């Protein structure tokens, strides 16, 4: 089953380029999250996750989380968010993909379909969760949102969108010493798979989606290793912001 192909999104990628590029950013973010959780011996299974957004990145973030046994309770769009305490399962995600990718519908229709809570004009960060994965837009998570997440017991934040957390939110996460992955590290999957495509095209290679997925996992593990190498503090806490910045600088310096 190749859901993205059935939605008409993947034909281009099937013909030219990597088979799983539409999934790359979302999958890659989850792979980075898994590496972070491993540093604290935390299993993702049954963890409650708040995801924002309902576009490409959010959809594939949720798809991968479901396959790993996590419980995703929120998704959102520019009008508001849904909160489903039973968790978004494969069937419900298929509904969202069809709603968004084919019909350009609104997320509130999910609440009508499945009888769950819909909150107009708000973001999902007030809901209780173990992990938050902002995957919608820039500056969608502010200092107050961060404090609410922390007060509700959130111990990991991994960014799928570009710069979704404001500087105040980032400061709050680092001060609380939770696992916090900035987008420049966690959402690098899309860029990475584009790089794999160039390699494939240049060398006239053809990789299966499984091979590309394996390479994506390895790339995200490598990025995580670099972040730990340059971001680990004396007290053992890994500052992934510093780690990503220094790792990026070292890469440029060596180039």
Where are the regions a protein language model picked out?
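Single conserved hydrophobic/aromatic residue that forms the stacking wall/gate
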Residues: 2-9, 13
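Glycine-rich phosphate/diphosphate-binding loop of Rossmann-like nucleotide-binding domains
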Residues: 15-23, 27-128
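Surface-exposed loop/turn and secondary-structure junction residues enriched for glycine/proline
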Residues: 16-18, 22, 47, 85-86, ...
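Hydrophobic alpha-helical scaffolding
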Residues: 19-23, 51-55, 65, 86, ...
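Conserved structured core elements
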Residues: 23, 27, 43-47, 51, ...
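Alpha-helical scaffold segments in soluble metabolic enzymes
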Residues: 28-35, 39, 60, 64, ...
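Rossmann-like adenosine-cofactor binding region
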Residues: 80-180, 185
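Adenosine-phosphate binding glycine-rich loop
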Residues: 150-255
């Amino acid at each position: 089953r190749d859901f993205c192909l059935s939605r008409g999104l993947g034909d281009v990628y099937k013909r030219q380029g990597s088979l799983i590029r539409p999934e790359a950013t979302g999958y890659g973010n989850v792979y980075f999250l898994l590496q972070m959780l491993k540093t604290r011996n935390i299993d993702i299974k049954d963890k409650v996750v708040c995801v924002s957004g309902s576009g490409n990145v959010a959809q594939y973030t949720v798809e991968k989380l479901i396959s790993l046994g996590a419980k995703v309770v929120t998704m959102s769009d520019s009008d508001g968010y849904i909160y489903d305490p039973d968790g978004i399962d494969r069937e419900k995600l298929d509904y969202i993909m069809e709603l968004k990718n084919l019909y350009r519908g609104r997320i509130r229709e999910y609440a009508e379909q499945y009888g769950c809570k819909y909150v107009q004009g708000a973001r999902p960060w007030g809901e209780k969760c173990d992990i938050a994965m902002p995957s919608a837009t820039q500056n969608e998570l502010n200092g107050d949102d961060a404090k609410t997440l922390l007060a509700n017991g959130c111990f990991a934040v991994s960014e799928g969108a570009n710069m979704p957390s404001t500087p105040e939110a980032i400061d709050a996460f680092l001060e609380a010493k939770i696992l916090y992955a900035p987008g420049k590290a966690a959402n690098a999957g899309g860029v990475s798979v584009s790089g794999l495509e160039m390699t494939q095209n240049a060398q006239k290679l053809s990789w299966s989606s499984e091979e590309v997925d394996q390479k994506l996992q390895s790339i995200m593990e490598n990025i995580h290793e670099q972040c730990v190498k340059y971001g680990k503090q004396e007290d053992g806490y890994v500052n992934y912001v510093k780690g990503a910045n220094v790792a990026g600088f070292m890469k440029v310096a060596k180039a």
